[in-house]
């Protein structure tokens, strides 16, 4: 089944939307709540902990579909928020579902189901879009890195509105740092728990974003600007 419960719904809510189910209920539609990182963490881990490893790895992860408005069509969702959502979609345990056209920044509207079923814009220079670069980079890593095929998953930070977790094997360590915070934060990620092999903090993340980070006492000390998300390979 489609994994809305621990993927699509919490990701969308964490980055600024109302919960999908609440938005469809008149009695709950106007209840405003900004999801915290702790709530997101509990939602994801409580679900994954109930699943055998083999089942966990094949969860049908998604946040857009033919029945849900496309996240990037919502004018309230910033480019930074969308980037964080896509990073999380690709790096949480499970199989990533890319809904057609998201990588092409397809048009649409959020007021009806028909609004998320627009035709593919084949006449558009899709490979020149920022979303194409985002999706293609993550897809290549997702399908070639052992950490995402058979590796572990561990939450490293879930305070305020920053959620950070690791995907890892004995030889690889990837960090997803996702922020919906309105403030700049300093976080500490205990990367020494993965072994002494991982102590070199890179200057940039996978997408070339400059990192203000250092390694101290077994931890990566990372400055996270408001609303920014990073995908980091530690070596």
Q: Residue locations for each model-derived region?
A:
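Structural recognition of the beta-strand scaffold that forms the well-ordered cores
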Residues: 60-62, 90-91, 96-100, 176
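Asparagine-centered strand-capping/turn motif at beta-strand->loop junctions
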Residues: 177-181
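Conserved, mostly hydrophobic/aromatic
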Residues: 66, 89, 101-103, 138, ...
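Solvent-exposed beta-strand/loop surfaces of large extracellular or lumenal domains
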Residues: 202-219
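C-terminal beta-strand-rich structural cap/linker in extracellular carbohydrate-active enzymes
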Residues: 214-235
